């Protein structure tokens, strides 16, 4: 299969690819999948065909949209899958982690304000505030675990691989253990934000929405979209490749 023209291959073969595989080939597919609420991160292991069937979507219509998006020059497409893992780690921290740290206190303040002012007539805002407070608390701990435990270890095994030095086993045994925990937490965060999207009816504003209300829903939508990209980079690229690197460096010294 030609990686450069993934959306121009036979439709039958294309539909068997998972959502994650498609986005890995060309990250611009993420924007199309977002519009159709196709989860390419936490549940990205579903085939394109199965995902469309589950949601009652017209697969051919989406493929056509993907083909049109691929007509744009590929020159500036970001090839995350080709990056060194330590560089990808820094990218995730500097872009997605920093975005979460900056935006989540602001959104939380708006969530509380909108729930207080509009909760009587729009009780869903009270529930959204409760859910987002859980997201806030969980992600704060999640980012800390990645930045203080998992990511430094990934940088360590990359350094060992490049220097061909003898690796030392981490206290957590295998990288698969913290990765399994991170993936579980990704799923939990994704589920919470999905429930928020349902409660907001896909971020649809009521007629009496004030400026803060409008800003708040835009922030929630942007936050969910960023989380999808963030989780995709980790679950579909960083983690699988890190597992392979760890297996390789220990195998070389055990053989």
Region spans (language model):
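Small-residue-biased structural context
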Residues: 1-255
